[in-house]
Amino acid sequence: MALGNGYYCAVVCVVLACASVVLCAPAQLCAGAADDDPRAARFCQALNTFLELYAEAAGEQVPEYQALVRDYPQLLDTGMKRQDVVHSFLRFGRRR
């Protein structure tokens, strides 16, 4: 019976995790504040779109982000200084 309680606890944890993701969705920052100015409305729409995409990427639900993390793990390693020559040329320019 203890094994059944473990499964019950796991199911409850998964349901709570899914509910917290749904409830923590980013709020619309300027939903009705920019109705008079069309430029402000476009800016607010772009800002809200960016925040939604950022929230998805932060949750690692975007396939492109997962592919980048999988294919280029050295980009995530910030503990070491980069040693490749191309990086120094891009940073300082190539002397002739």
From Swiss-Prot:
Protein role: Myoinhibiting neuropeptide.
Domain of life: Eukaryota
Tissues and organs where the protein is expressed, per its UniProt entry: Expressed in corpora cardiaca (CC), corpora allata (CA), antennal lobe (AL) and gnathal ganglion (GNG) (at protein level). In its non-pyroglutamate form, expression in GNG detected in all animals, in AL, CC and in CA in most animals (at protein level). In its pyroglutamate form, expression in CC, CA and GNG detected in all animals, in AL in some animals (at protein level).
Family to which this protein belongs: Belongs to the myosuppressin family.
Biological classification of the source: Eukaryota, Metazoa, Ecdysozoa, Arthropoda, Hexapoda
Keywords on record: Amidation, Cleavage on pair of basic residues, Neuropeptide, Pyrrolidone carboxylic acid, Secreted, Signal
Gene Ontology CC terms, in alphabetical order: extracellular region
GO biological process: neuropeptide signaling pathway
Residue span(s) of the pro-peptide: 25-80, 96
Pyrrolidone carboxylic acid: residues carrying this PTM: Q83
UniProt protein name: Myosuppressin
Signal peptide: 1-24
